[in-house]
């Protein structure tokens, strides 16, 4: 029983540990990137004003956006304005990130893991869409600066016009934004505003184009760049990042250690299980001889042995699954201790590998069948007459 309990427990623990590491690493990449594909072109700019004056107005020339419609059959897309150094009125020492979005398009394109917010993030987008001045801010504005729902917040970048918004919600997480707990000092300031509001105050500013793949591949963006001979200032391909993750030596090594560890335990436990039953059958040769002398057929003897195995092994497998689940619940969360808060980004979530667990059951089942075949063959090889004579002596 101990052999089977150890095998099942180690298998469950290894499967859930590997699946948790893999899935959370993928979720982190998708969250940090924000979308399947992100590109930004170089914008031509000209300064207007008196020479040598710092506050000269800068006018940007927007690249032709209509060419992106060539990819309408391959991806959904939206314009996203990102600024990383926005000042907050009344808090001169605070610098915030700003994300200007079109709420409907952003909801269709961005990647956001379920369960990170108290409500589905679509509810926050719906709230923003009701008011052009509606903004969402990180919880650091509430916890550190005392802002409340419905308060007005003013922000600006360098010498640009001040934008005033109304706070419609506080969020810890948002696609592409660093959450407060991942900040260097436990705080992170970011503002999510309507792109129309930002452009009305600041004019047309360089923006990024976020895309969501309609298929499994992102090859279309490479074909697009080659067709128009574009060298992007910023280029993010989440699919490529996920492939790089899976090819990472440390990542592969971790998965390899877990897999090899389970295989070694499976082999050792299977050999131990088989040795135990071989010795058990050899010591019960007289008992099997008596059963045959009582009129039991070989089929009935094998059926009895099968039922014995079924009940003993069934209890062991159930106990092993319970021990494995308990060990996963207690020790898998300790994985996050290996990462600093800045690397963690989003909370670690224990993942149950249903497919891997089913494979484990199949492997253990095959091992059990092989062992039963070997044991059945050994029982048939027992010389019943010799066993009975041994009993008479």
For the regions a language model picked out, list residue spans one by one.
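Peri-transmembrane interface segments
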Residues: 222-269, 280-283, 304
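Small-residue transmembrane helix packing/gating motifs
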Residues: 32, 129, 173-216
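A short beta-strand structural signal in non-transmembrane regions
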Residues: 36-42, 141-142, 199-234
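Alpha-helical transmembrane segments
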Residues: 6-36, 278, 327, 331-336
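Interfacial "coupling" helices/loops that link adjacent transmembrane helices in transporter permeases
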Residues: 272-313
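N-terminal Sec/SRP start-transfer signal
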Residues: 1-8, 280, 297, 303-306, ...
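Short helix-loop junctions at transmembrane helix boundaries
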Residues: 251, 257, 318-386
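Short beta-strand boundary microenvironments
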Residues: 27-36, 41-152, 164-173, 186
């Amino acid at each position: 029983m101990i052999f089977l309990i150890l095998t099942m427990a180690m298998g469950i623990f290894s499967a859930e540990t590997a699946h948790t590491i893999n899935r959370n690493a993928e979720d982190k990449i998708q969250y940090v990137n924000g979308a399947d594909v992100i590109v930004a072109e170089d914008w031509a700019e000209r300064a207007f004003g008196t020479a040598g004056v710092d506050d000269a107005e800068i006018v940007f020339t927007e690249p032709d956006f209509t060419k992106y419609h060539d990819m309408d059959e391959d991806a959904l897309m939206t314009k996203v304005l990102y600024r990383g150094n926005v000042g907050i009125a009344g808090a001169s020492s605070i610098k915030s990130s700003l994300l200007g979005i079109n709420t409907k398009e952003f909801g269709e394109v961005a990647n956001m893991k379920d369960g990170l917010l108290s409500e589905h993030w679509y509810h926050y987008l719906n709230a923003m869409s009701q008011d052009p001045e509606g903004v969402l801010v990180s919880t650091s504005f509430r916890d550190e600066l005392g802002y409340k729902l419905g308060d007005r917040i003013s922000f600006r970048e360098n010498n640009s016009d001040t934008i005033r918004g109304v706070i419609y919600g506080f969020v810890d997480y948002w696609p592409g934004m660093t959450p407060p707990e991942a900040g260097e000092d436990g705080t992170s300031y970011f503002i999510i505003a309507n792109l129309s509001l930002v452009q009305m105050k600041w004019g047309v500013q360089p923006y990024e184009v976020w895309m969501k793949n309609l298929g499994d591949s992102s090859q279309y963006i490479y074909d697009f760049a080659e067709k128009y001979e574009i060298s992007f200032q910023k280029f993010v391909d989440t699919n490529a990042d996920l492939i790089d993750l899976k090819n990472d030596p440390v990542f592969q090594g971790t998965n390899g250690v877990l897999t090899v560890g389970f295989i070694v335990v499976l082999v050792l436990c299977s050999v131990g299980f088989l040795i135990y039953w071989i010795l058990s059958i050899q010591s019960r040769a007289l008992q099997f001889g008596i059963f045959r002398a009582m009129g039991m057929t070989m089929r009935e003897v094998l059926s009895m042995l099968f039922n014995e195995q079924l009940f003993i092994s069934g209890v062991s497998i159930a106990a092993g699954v319970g021990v494995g689940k308990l060990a996963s619940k207690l020790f898998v969360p300790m994985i996050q201790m290996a990462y600093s808060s800045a690397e963690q980004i989003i909370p670690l979530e224990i993942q149950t590998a249903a497919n891997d667990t089913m494979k484990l059951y199949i492997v253990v089942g095959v091992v059990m069948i092989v062992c039963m075949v070997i044991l059945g063959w050994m029982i048939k090889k027992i010389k019943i007459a010799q066993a009975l004579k041994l009993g008479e002596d």
